């Protein structure tokens, strides 16, 4: 069901879509619309790979802009399609135009900071989204504000459930590598669409408001 609504066999996209699916299903029992946090990592340097830019603020700012411009093809695709698959409307307040403009005016050195791991206001030697965490320090519990970054599928625990399911589909007792995982997803997608090659041919080609020829 996740792959059907996602219309993608991308490994990372599918992995993150699974906890989104369960969260959307639970939320839809009670509400018709939810607020999500998409955009915060792209605006305030929230990904662990950003650590490589901690001493290169100009390059970090450029990378944040690049990832923000690519969101429609990754995280926003996941959130929009999976939530609508449960008839739930997801709204993204971090992507309000005025907030984007304000966030991009904040120096990159305040978003990703070198910190003392023993400090109460740190997640380690490098702290992501520092200024955003600081701004919310009086609004949310300390342990929540300063918890270490975890990918959605890891933090939710669905990555372990998925590993077991993939092993069953692959007919093995051991771990399934990324290439096998991708093939499993492509097989599931192919089984659900008459002409899946049309999806594969154009997946990921939306860029800068145009469709590139596959």
Name each model feature, range by range:
Residues 1-139, 153-165, 178-214:
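ATP-dependent adenylate-handling active sites, centered on carboxylate activation for C-N bond formation
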Residues 141-151:
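Conserved S-adenosyl-L-methionine
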Residues 166, 170-171:
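Non-catalytic structural connector segments
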């Amino acid at each position: 069901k996740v792959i059907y609504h996602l219309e993608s066999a991308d490994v990372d996209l599918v992995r993150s879509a699974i906890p989104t699916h369960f969260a959307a299903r639970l939320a839809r029992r009670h509400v018709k619309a939810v607020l999500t946090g998409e955009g915060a990592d792209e605006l305030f340097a929230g990904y662990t790979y950003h650590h490589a830019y901690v001493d290169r603020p100009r390059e970090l700012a450029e990378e944040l802009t690049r990832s923000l411009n690519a969101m429609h093809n990754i995280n926003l695709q996941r959130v929009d399609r999976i939530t609508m698959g449960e008839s739930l409307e997801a709204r993204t307040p971090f992507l309000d135009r005025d907030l984007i403009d304000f966030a991009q005016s904040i120096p990159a050195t305040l978003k990703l900071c070198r910190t003392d791991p023993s400090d109460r206001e740190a997640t380690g030697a490098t702290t992501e989204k520092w200024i955003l965490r600081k701004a919310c320090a009086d609004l949310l519990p300390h342990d929540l504000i300063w918890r270490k970054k975890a990918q959605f599928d890891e933090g939710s625990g669905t990555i372990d459930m998925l590993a077991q399911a993939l092993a069953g589909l692959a007919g093995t007792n051991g771990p399934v590598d990324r290439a096998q995982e991708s093939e499993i997803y492509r097989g599931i997608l192919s089984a659900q669409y008459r002409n899946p090659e049309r999806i594969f041919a154009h997946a990921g080609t939306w860029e800068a408001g145009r469709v590139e020829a596959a």
